[in-house]
Amino acid sequence: MEKKTANDVVTLARAQDRLTTLEYIEAIFEDFLEFHGDRYFADDLAVVGGVATLQGKPVTVVGIQKGRNLPENIERNFGSPNPEGYRKALRLMKQAEKFNRPVITFVNTAGAYCGIGAEERGEGEAIAQNLLEMSDLKVPIISVIIGEGGSGGALALAVADEVWMLEHTIYAVLSPEGFASILWKDGSRAKEAAELMKITATELKELAIVDKVIPEVMNGQPLEQAKINRMLQKAFISKLTELAKLDTETLLEKRYQRFRKY
């Protein structure tokens, strides 16, 4: 199979048939109980989360939810969270800390919502607060990019002990279209921009920005989704078992150094 270009990966990352956060939760975890609302303003349906079990042990799972079709995407705001979505995520993560549950996040967003209402309600502050709190959260955190990882809207759920990416996903400070518009004043050069930006899982693993790439193709053939789900489940169990052996001080120091090295 011919090697995929960065633009090919962008297309695959945005594909509407990619599994959503809720579908991964259903496939990997048991006993999921969804929580709603940020306790300040509203329940942002672009962010989902709650408590589940993994191999019989409680975990908190949080993720950004896109829709499968136009009505679902309208309901989920096309996976672009408002500030109340990030505040809901933080509420669940602080609850996880209180009850000593590890946190697993799933990221798939083009970026945080940039509407007037979102800005008025403190979109930037909500993202910044998540970065601050996650950096010092006293339980293990694993973040997985399952589609698009766009800008601060993605990073707000990805300050983790380990960040993983599925093979055909992207993680970037902005979209290739945005990059081309800013650099060349020509959004039509997005394909060219994608090749320069180093946004694919393979490139980011080489740069040590991400810690693990979950394969979606093996021996030139697409892997069955069920096999990808099993790989993720086993990897979660293995890594959480490893992180659970660390005392809190060591866990936080390693997390700090992980981001400090950039």
UniProtKB/Swiss-Prot annotation:
Domain CoA carboxyltransferase C-terminal intervals: 1-242
Pathway entry: Lipid metabolism; malonyl-CoA biosynthesis; malonyl-CoA from acetyl-CoA: step 1/1
Reactions listed under catalytic activity: N(6)-carboxybiotinyl-L-lysyl-[protein] + acetyl-CoA = N(6)-biotinyl-L-lysyl-[protein] + malonyl-CoA
Pfam families, sorted: ACCA
Lineage: Bacteria, Bacillati, Bacillota, Bacilli, Lactobacillales
MF (Gene Ontology): acetyl-CoA carboxylase activity; ATP binding; carboxyl- or carbamoyltransferase activity
Oligomer status and interactors: Acetyl-CoA carboxylase is a heterohexamer composed of biotin carboxyl carrier protein (AccB), biotin carboxylase (AccC) and two subunits each of ACCase subunit alpha (AccA) and ACCase subunit beta (AccD).
InterPro entries: Acetyl_CoA_COase_a_su (IPR001095), ClpP/crotonase-like_dom_sf (IPR029045), COA_CT_C (IPR011763)
Protein's job: Component of the acetyl coenzyme A carboxylase (ACC) complex. First, biotin carboxylase catalyzes the carboxylation of biotin on its carrier protein (BCCP) and then the CO(2) group is transferred by the carboxyltransferase to acetyl-CoA to form malonyl-CoA.
EC number: 2.1.3.15
Entry-linked PANTHER family: ACETYL-COENZYME A CARBOXYLASE CARBOXYL TRANSFERASE SUBUNIT ALPHA (PTHR42853), ACETYL-COENZYME A CARBOXYLASE CARBOXYL TRANSFERASE SUBUNIT ALPHA, CHLOROPLASTIC (PTHR42853:SF3)
Family membership noted in the UniProt record: Belongs to the AccA family.
Subcellular location(s) per record: Cytoplasm
Name used for this protein in its record: Acetyl-coenzyme A carboxylase carboxyl transferase subunit alpha
Cellular component annotations (GO), alphabetically ordered: acetyl-CoA carboxylase complex
Stored NCBIfam families: accA, AccA_sub, PRK05724.1, PRK12319.1
